[in-house]
Amino acid sequence: KIDGYPVDYWNCKRICWYNNKYCNDLCKGLKADSGYCWGWTLSCYCQGLPDNARIKRSGRCRA
C-alpha cells in the first residue's frame, strides 16, 4: 500500500477546503484506508492506497 495525493486525469491534485469528510470519502472510493484534507496544500491526502493508485509524483497539472 502507498500514501499520497490522489490525482485526476490531468495529473492535478484533488482540491479540498479543509473538508476532511470529502477527502475521506474520496480516498475510500479509491480503495484507501482513510484520507484527510491537508491544510497547507488544500489537497486531499490518502493513506493506504493500492500500490497501483494514481498519486502525485512529478509533472505539472495539465488542466
Swiss-Prot record:
PROSITE patterns: LCN_CSAB. GO terms for molecular function: calcium channel regulator activity; sodium channel inhibitor activity; toxin activity. SUPFAM superfamilies: Scorpion toxin-like. It is found in: Secreted. Expressed by the venom gland. Pfam families: Toxin_3. Signal peptide: none annotated. It comes from the Eukaryota. Belongs to the long (4 C-C) scorpion toxin superfamily. Sodium channel inhibitor family. Alpha subfamily. This is Kurtoxin.
